[in-house]
Amino acid sequence: MSRYRGPRLKKIRRLGALPGLTRKTPKSGSNLKKKFHSGKKEQYRIRLQEKQKLRFHYGLTERQLLRYVHIAGKAKRSTGQVLLQLLEMRLDNTLFRLGMASTIPGARQLVNHRHILVNGRIVNIPSFRCKPRDIITTKDNQRSKDLVRNSIASSDPGKLPKHLTIDTLEYKGLVNKILDRKWVGLKINELLVVEY
């Protein structure tokens, strides 16, 4: 399966809030969940929805998600927690959480168009894994700084997780440490994803 490029509000109505996918919210009167799906949910459907939440929020393909689950399964710690740490430490997600991009697809585009430097080097791979003490900056040209300035101005500084710090004047972000489970930006039961 390829990356999802279809209507985003349909996915939000179906799966609930996905802040990484879009900032838009559906109208309060148009709740398709209550209209079509009543009664008891089956276990398979619950697990599938949790997996789809993870996929659409982080903008992953099915194969990428399976690869991350495989890597997390080899770790000695809790598989679900390691999976979330791997996904949260991706460069595109880190840019989104810093407020340098309004959505994860927007952050992915910034990285692909070579506007972002990590430790002074251009990185154009959105799945680049950030490590503690990595410094994330914008390129030194005006266009790159304008793109990031608009996103920082519209972001909420109170939502910045504890493992990241940002200098809004120099458009510079710092990864302090590896993320704790309580600072994940998505309400999800990661064990159901691993079981799926």
Swiss-Prot record:
Disulfide bonds: none
Locations listed in the record: Plastid, Chloroplast
Cellular compartments per GO CC: chloroplast; small ribosomal subunit
Keyword presence, Hydrolase: no
GO-annotated biological processes: ribosomal small subunit biogenesis; translation
Disordered: annotated segments: 16-40
Major location category of this protein: plastid
Keywords: Chloroplast, Plastid, Ribonucleoprotein, Ribosomal protein, RNA-binding, rRNA-binding
Origin: domain of life: Eukaryota
Keyword Ribonucleoprotein set for record: yes
Molecular function via GO: rRNA binding; structural constituent of ribosome
InterPro entries for this protein: Ribosomal_uS4, Ribosomal_uS4_bac-type, Ribosomal_uS4_CS, Ribosomal_uS4_N, S4_RNA-bd, S4_RNA-bd_sf
Gene3D superfamilies according to UniProt: Ribosomal Protein S4 Delta 41, Chain A, domain 1, RNA-binding S4 domain
Signal peptide span: none
Role description: One of the primary rRNA binding proteins, it binds directly to 16S rRNA where it nucleates assembly of the body of the 30S subunit. With S5 and S12 plays an important role in translational accuracy.
Subunit architecture: Part of the 30S ribosomal subunit. Contacts protein S5. The interaction surface between S4 and S5 is involved in control of translational fidelity.
Family: Belongs to the universal ribosomal protein uS4 family.
Protein name: Small ribosomal subunit protein uS4c
Organism the protein comes from: Anthoxanthum odoratum (Sweet vernal grass)
Gene name of the encoded protein: rps4
